[in-house]
């Protein structure tokens, strides 16, 4: 990879002096990029049920362009009906898709961003209920996660799919996209051909690495025969599965791609079975996989894209300056704050809405649609902005009892719409259950969420008072309630997390529970020196949260001297063990009335409740409901008059 030409400080925009490499220009194939701010491809499910481009998808991606991302790589677009990976996957498999693709390309152009359409085929990593037919793959080997037997592709079918990729690239170019990215990573069809882990063929498409590369290189050649468009290929540097590709094989693949004329190489990691490597959770190192991209960048001269939980300018700047990549891809951070580049450019990094890698966005990619706890506008970007800008016709004095991410969000929105909002808090710390979470080793980033929500509310004029409301202060009172599953007893995991149940050091402590709160209570106790065992009747821990938390806490609890025991029929421990109770089962399904705690009941009768929760998806649901409450038009109730 060529060295970076850095602009002199005098030529940089305000706020960019701290990251001159990030603001340096770059040529990517035919594209001239003014800087290195690029958004990674991420599934949203914002397409229509037939795979059509929707206004929702256009608004979502265009908001990132307007926010300063100079390059946006779209989510994967299906090249063939057998390759649909999600219910609402964007499809580029037929010329009837051209009009919709053109609308998306036009929206990106109008936003100021260059756009690259990622084209893909899921291979064995899908479900037949999405494709409507049996899955296809290099070999008849099921994905261990999906466990559906695919059909091995015949030679003539492989040629047909090569042409399908080329046709999808042609459609993307005709629609007005500035480039195309072939998705050859993460275990999808092209990646499946590349790896001996999933490719057991004995013909010219299997066996040696040269043979396994043939399908991908045929696609590249076919596209190149028709166009010199900017062409990027995404690969997994290491698949992190036994028998899968490692950096050695991937580096050879990268060299071959350069020889066949690609414009850039996007370096990711993993397959479905090692999914946690692709979507690291809070507590994992930022920029973790950038060194792998750097190893490949040293072997090729085309620009290399890098990934790995990049959420701050300093990490991206160091990656470019150190030669680890030419283009650091902002993924979930771009969901959390579409204006991230603009805020960095203006020297307002403290105003960036932080991504803490809670993975609620990823956890919902195959379910309804992408959402984000710090940014309730995701997926309704245009509508949310219009509603936020609409002044409340009858401004009220609104009091909110309690601070949590949801209540601070409601306070911000209500104040932005013209209401006079005061938040009352009598607990020692701001932030509710996410404030508690900051005390857990590796989870301190959740304090960033609370701090950002507090700054945003204060910027809209919200007051936070450390007392109860007085008579006549509020015309409406909204109160925080907490999702705290019944039956935990006392002391319980929430007492430990909150810090209201302190134990003398060096005890034997038995934590009973199977959810995220139980695991993090166990981790917190182990970290301060208790001999801690986490027991659950479930098959694993953290089953109510993203699988990444399961992986990190299975590692961290033993690292701090604790133990994890699953599938326990009857809790047991040493005679001297102090028991800390938690929910016996992972939370889910219907929420019972006694699953709610009302810590602010003494403040008076609430006109509405705002939900606080520990587990990220429930927390985020509370944020979205609170946003809707604040967007509504409450009638004056005469409270306190």
Where are these regions (language model features)?
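Short, structured coil segments at secondary-structure junctions
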Residues: 300, 323-324, 460, 528, ...
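Hydrophobic beta-strand scaffold positions of dinucleotide-using enzymes
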Residues: 39, 265, 477-478, 584
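Short loop/edge segments at beta-strand edges and connector loops
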Residues: 308, 428, 465-468, 564-569, ...
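Flavin-dependent oxidoreductase catalytic cores
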Residues: 1-399, 405, 410-420, 429
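Rossmann-like dinucleotide/flavin-binding elements
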Residues: 392-422, 465-472, 482-544, 573-581, ...
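Rossmann-like dinucleotide-binding cores of NAD(P)H-dependent redox enzymes
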Residues: 420-460, 516-517, 522-567, 614-616, ...
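Extracellular/periplasmic ectodomains of large secreted or surface enzymes and adhesion receptors
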Residues: 354, 365-403, 450-460, 476-504, ...
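Flexible, Lys/Arg-rich cytosolic regulatory linkers and terminal tails that connect or flank
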Residues: 356-377, 560, 616-641
